[in-house]
């Protein structure tokens, strides 16, 4: 683990305990006891940012905190569990000009967030606060984290200090875990990474005889492993090595040195006994309490005023709050709601709205040895238990009838929820079980306090937009796993297809306005639009939107005809996927076409099904609770009990997805836009390129199309001239505006961009 050390972390927590006790601060319930503002800085002409730290404590015996894994093993001398969380506030300098709405943003892997200009134009307040306590990569804890006074150079990231679990007798907690090395070449040692950040756990011993290192030639999307062999304990070391310090290198618990070096065509997996698990579930409570403090408290226990408090100290300038998280952070919010954290220990509702963005699962956080940086690669948790909002009995996995909103519904603390996502979340991030469950036999209704918007034919988070006949921006498979070994400059090889440009930006702009109106004024947003088995919207247990809290003074328009909203098997025939698109391997995206094995070209390619990344039902052992994603996993690697059926949206004759919310570039296309791509190098060569989408442009002319045997109509055949294309864009713009998924100012912008483009000029 990155510096500072575990011992230093424990010392910092001890400092907090001593400071609170010496000051005689009350400790009746979980709360923020102290805040320190480290820095103020201007943000434009009328806003400012405040960076600081919040010191908090939790009652481990309170029922709302008891669900935190190992919380009893993280107690300090006063019987409480303590944490330190960084934060940033963005607010009007003149707080009386604030709108009353607080956006509480969840950082992604420590990345600090500042509300955008559109939100500042409304007078909104922004809060970014820490939740991820693994002290790794972007969440590394600074050396001055526990300073009782302002620090000169505060961190630019968000980090959280959480306790290390200790056995009741004070001894070290240990357990078996797993780590992987992928796409590493040469004799230099390999760091153990999760996504692209260091593994947050260290081995209990550097004796390699106490661990098992294996290599493998291949693993399929279904988790089938081939060509596996065990590497002798004398042939590797827990060490850092390079040309100057060859094998066995210098002892280092964070890296593996392999005698003879690493083969980039192999994947390496180590199972070992780790020590000092972090009580990472504290992150749920810390994020809850920091947000609620700034929403409601006048001052901390030491008299430091809440910077959002009213001048007369009669409360704060915050009337409403919306929790928001993107990707990993959106997964955090789904887990946050599922485990009942949208109420504090006094049973008060924390957030009025929750917006998980491009997030289709619950975060892997609240179990021992959790790795929250994971992105659902093989043997990574996150798809266990209910991924759906309403109750559903998971008969396929033998789990009880549950839903994400169970706990908040029982206590009357459920927020309004909007979620949106696109095609990449279907093809790589295992989203479809949220819609149809694990048996894929029926559409799971969504409660009336939830809106779901599917942005079709888009990559993870959307592309860069614009109207370009031949996009050239490369798509790179993310993390350390998929793209292949980096070159001498550290660059990952690009994927087969250029980056999918279809944006989320304009759709998100509209959703933002609708969510504010829903939370602040009770005005209903557009009805949900997403693919279903029946091709129909399924909202509420009885489909009755009239029970929704709020007023609907506009026409709720589905936007896209219902006939397009179908989910089908991920086969070319069922999807209606066109054959013969230039540059695409045959059978993709139904199957991967494997052209090499162990770096050696195959005389005859292998067709491997599926290409999509399915949900794998793992056996994590008897101490793991799959419904809550809590407990202690003991099986490493976990056996795959079964592969869960996966469905995908249908596509049109160009391969673009049908249905979903109207998106201008999808509806006035310049190519085929996919939520998937193909890896071209490294261990996962020829397989799905993680969560990165691609594009295959249309030919410009009919002659060029025929010469390339392209079954798709050319731009010339579709639109005729540049003016014809601008007319098609204007029609798509009008459709999106009518459906309330495009703001008027963005409509004009898109028209102007299309008019100024070089399309068919």
Predicted regions span which residues?
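C-terminal His-loop and adjacent cap/lid subdomain of alpha/beta-hydrolase
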Residues: 30-761
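N-terminal secretory signal peptides that target proteins for export/translocation
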Residues: 1-10
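Bacterial N-terminal signal peptides
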Residues: 12-23
